[in-house]
Every structure is written in C-alpha cells, then in structure tokens.
C-alpha cells in the first residue's frame, strides 16, 4: 500500500483582523500566493500531475465563496486542476490533508495540494454563516440557555442529561468558559499558558525559526509582509493577569489566554512515497494516521482528546511514542484540558508557541500547524 508523505509547505505571515498587515488581501489571492510558494519548492512536480487542490476554509462565503479552491486553481493558470473547498471550521485544512492521505492510500491519485485560508478582515464582504434568520428554531431553547449563562454560570453539564438539545450555534468563547467550568482549570493556569505561548513564540522568532517557516506575502500595493503581527515580546504573567474576562462577567477567558482574530493562508504538498522517489524529492514527513471525534458542541474544545486517541490507535502507538504535539490554541483552557486528559508532557507541547501568540486564521490553522 502506498504511503503518503509531505514534500513541501508554505505559510503566510499571520495578520491581525481589521487592523493588521493583511487587511487588503482577498482570501483567494492570499491562498494563491501560498499554493504558488509551496509548489515553487518542488519544481520537479509538474502541476498537471497534481490530482486535486483541496482547500479548507471556515467561512467559505463572500470573497471566499464560489468554491474558492477552484478559484485559486484558475487564478494560478491551472484550469486543468480540480478544486474542492472543505469546511470543518478550525480543522478545515487538517481535514484536507487527511483527504489527500486517504486518496493516496486508496490509490486514487499520487499528488495533492492541501491548503487553508481565512481572512477575517474580509468578512464584511460576506460569510457562509452570516445570513440573518438562518438558525433552526429547534435550537432556540438551547440558544436562550447560552444567553443566560453568558451572564454568569457556576457549572456546566451536558444538556443531553436533561433530554435537551445542545446549542449548535454557541459562540466559541462561551464554549471555552464551559470547558473551564467542566474541567476546573483555573484562570491562573490559563494565563500562565498564554504567557508561555507568547514567550515561546518570542524565543522562536529570535532563533529565526519563523523566518524560515514563513513565505512572504506581496500586498496589492507591492508591499512585502514577512512577519506575524501577533507575538508580543516581553509578555509577563503580571500583565496578563490584569486583563478582564471577555465572555462572562465571572469568566476566566481573556484576550491574554485566547487567540485573536486573524488573516492568513498556508499550503502543503502531499504525495505518495513512490511519486516522491520518482521525482527525487526527500519527504519532510510521513502521514501515519488521523482521527476525528465528536462531543457536545458546548465543550467543543475538548475534541482533541478522543481524536488523538483514535489516531494513536490506528497507528498502534501511544502518547509516550510521540516526541512533539501541537494542539491549537484557540483558548488556553482547551489545550490544557485536552493535554492533561491525554497525559501529554507540556514540555513536548506547542514548543514554539501557538495561536494565542501567532494567531488563528480558522481555515489556515491546520496547514499552519503542519507546516
């Protein structure tokens, strides 16, 4: 059976939404630059040999609509290249890599582009979830329950225990507060993780790590952007601990222990081991196994627990076999909750910082973590 390997990656700098370095970039243009950058690193690969361009996007509407994956392919001059846009929200471009992995394992292709993009700055031009009056009234009671707990709550339990529907439209900040209540993870622990993320990112920047990882972006006016907007040098617990809760008056989630809103794109070239050998390419990594899981949407941040268990099970491995872990830092509480339940050594986790410092463009993040 063929193996799936990663032979090239590219990721843009990450901009702050609405006020950062990439506000002028359309999502299709930004994604096209990163796909081009990833392909430029493997000139032996003829674009006509690519089987599909799979692009993850958390809000595939507005400027990111019209099957943006196909738009990107055509923009690059690859009218012959199919494209599919995938929405699994914050893990969209992990899912596209998973799809490439599965296609290669099934023998249905030997070279794929897995990409991801999100430009929150461009959301005023339209989003897939932005239409008014589109919520299913079946969930009205659940939404009212969420609105009530946003004013303050002392605990969380699964509404299914009361034969009630969970809130599928719940804001992510509310889910983070629920995770904090459910796990008992303190504000101090969350703040210290947020500081760690910033400090680790600062160390990685100073060592040149991100300079090697980032592919510069050329803006419409010709300006070149090559660094992330988010990392804050000299972040301390004393500073972070003074911030006020964002989502609940009695909450623990703040701007210092959660990710900001962002713009960014990334791309990964995945191919079979035989194709890489044929082209004389040295793989950067081999994809061994993947896993997905579901749980109450009201505590969505603990999803990595069962997903990691599944992937390790398929790979016939254990947590102790893994040298480095990446869990997306949408919120510190979800990283800590997942890592502690899995028994992950924090010294192996998000070693160069994570989304709290770097940023979290939803559809991009999976490919950024991979890169």
For each predicted feature, which ranges?
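Beta-strand segments within the central parallel beta-sheet cores of soluble alpha/beta enzyme folds
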Residues: 47-56, 84-88, 112-116, 189-196, ...
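Conserved active-site "lid/cap" helical segment
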Residues: 1-72, 76, 175-187, 204, ...
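Flexible glycine-/small-residue-enriched beta->alpha junction loops
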Residues: 111-178
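Glycine- and Gly-Pro-enriched alpha-helical subdomains that act as flexible
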Residues: 273-321, 339
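N-terminal extracellular/periplasmic Venus flytrap/periplasmic-binding protein-like
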Residues: 11-13, 24-33, 44, 152, ...
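Conserved catalytic cysteine-centered active-site region
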Residues: 57-112, 152, 167-170, 234-260, ...
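Active-site-proximal alpha-helical scaffold in enzymes
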Residues: 73, 84, 88-118, 126, ...
């Amino acid at each position: 059976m063929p193996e799936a390997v990663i032979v090239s990656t590219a990721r843009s700098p990450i901009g702050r939404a609405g006020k950062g370095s990439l506000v002028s970039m359309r999502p299709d243009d930004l994604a096209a630059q990163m796909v081009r950058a990833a392909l430029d690193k493997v000139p032996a690969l003829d674009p006509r040999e690519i089987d599909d361009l799979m692009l993850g996007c958390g809000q595939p509407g507005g400027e990111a609509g019209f099957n943006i994956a196909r738009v990107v392919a055509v923009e690059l001059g690859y009218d012959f290249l199919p494209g599919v846009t995938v929405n699994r929200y914050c893990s969209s471009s992990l899912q596209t890599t998973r799809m490439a992995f599965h296609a290669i394992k099934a023998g249905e292709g030997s070279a794929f582009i897995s990409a991801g993009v999100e430009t929150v700055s461009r959301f005023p031009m339209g989003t897939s979830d932005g239409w008014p009056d589109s919520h299913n009234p079946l969930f009205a009671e659940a939404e009212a329950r969420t609105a009530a707990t946003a004013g303050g709550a002392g605990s969380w339990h699964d509404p299914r225990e009361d034969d009630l529907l969970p809130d599928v439209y719940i804001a992510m900040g509310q889910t983070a507060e629920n995770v904090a209540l459910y796990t008992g993870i303190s504000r101090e622990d969350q703040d210290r993780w947020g500081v760690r993320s910033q400090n680790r990112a600062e160390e990685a920047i100073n060592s040149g790590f991100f300079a090697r990882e980032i592919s510069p972006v050329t803006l419409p006016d010709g300006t070149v952007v090559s660094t992330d907007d988010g990392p804050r040098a000299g972040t301390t617990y004393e500073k972070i601990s003074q911030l006020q809760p964002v989502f609940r008056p009695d909450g623990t989630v703040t701007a210092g222990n959660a990710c900001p809103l962002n713009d960014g794109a990334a791309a990964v070239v995945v191919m079979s081991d035989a194709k890489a050998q044929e082209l004389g390419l040295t793989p950067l990594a081999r994809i061994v196994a993947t896993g997905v899981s579901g749980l109450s949407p009201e505590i969505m941040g603990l999803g990595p627990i069962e997903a990691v268990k599944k992937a390790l099970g398929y790979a016939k491995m254990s947590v102790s076999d893994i040298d480095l872990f990446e869990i997306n830092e949408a919120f510190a509480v979800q990283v800590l909750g997942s890592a502690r339940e899995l028994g992950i050594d924090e010294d192996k986790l998000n070693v160069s910082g994570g989304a709290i410092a770097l940023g979290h463009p939803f559809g991009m993040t999976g490919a950024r973590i991979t890169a």
